[in-house]
Structures are given as structure tokens and as C-alpha cells.
Amino acid sequence: MTDTNDRMTKLQTMHQRAPDDTFLIYAIAMEHKKLGQLSQAIEWLGRVVEKDPTYCAAYHQAALTHEESGDLEAAKKWYRDGIAAAGRKGDTHTMGEMQAALAAIE
């Protein structure tokens, strides 16, 4: 078993024990992204924001992952939603990063 598979197995096991832990869900998403499994990464990032609509990093990573897969329209939507979430949360730094990224693809 490779280190990456071992990490994914451990994350999945922890997730079974704590299914509402958004950090674990985010970690699983990022592991999928690292493996090049972009659609799975996006699915898991969607789960993060379903559980915590203020988890700004999930919006940003979902947008970046959509960009990587070539779906710029979906990326724009994730950026816009993330900018709104960051604004509600008062996270001006992340909001600025996503605004700049959105401007770069519009």
C-alpha cells in the first residue's frame, strides 16, 4: 500500500467515526485532489460547504479544482459563492484572494 493510499484509508476511517468533522472532509477532498481525482475532490469540497457554509478554503479549493479541470464557469460560481461566504464571515483576506482569482478568469 502506498503512503497516499494509507493516508486516504486513515482519513476515511476517521471520517466514519466523526462524519460531521469538516476538517476531515476537507482533508479527504485534498487527498483526492493530490491523487488527480478532481471530480471526487469537488464532491467532497461540496460536502464541506454543506456542513459549514463559512468554510472559505473549501470554496477556494473547489474553484481552483474546477479551473484545473477546465470548467471555468463552475470555477466562477465557486469563487462568487466563496466571496459571499467570506464577506459574511468577515474574512477579508480570503475574500480578496478569491476576488483576484475570479478577476483573472473573467
PLM segments and residue spans:
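Structural marker of alpha-solenoid helical repeat scaffolds
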Residues: R17, E50-K51, E68, A85-K89
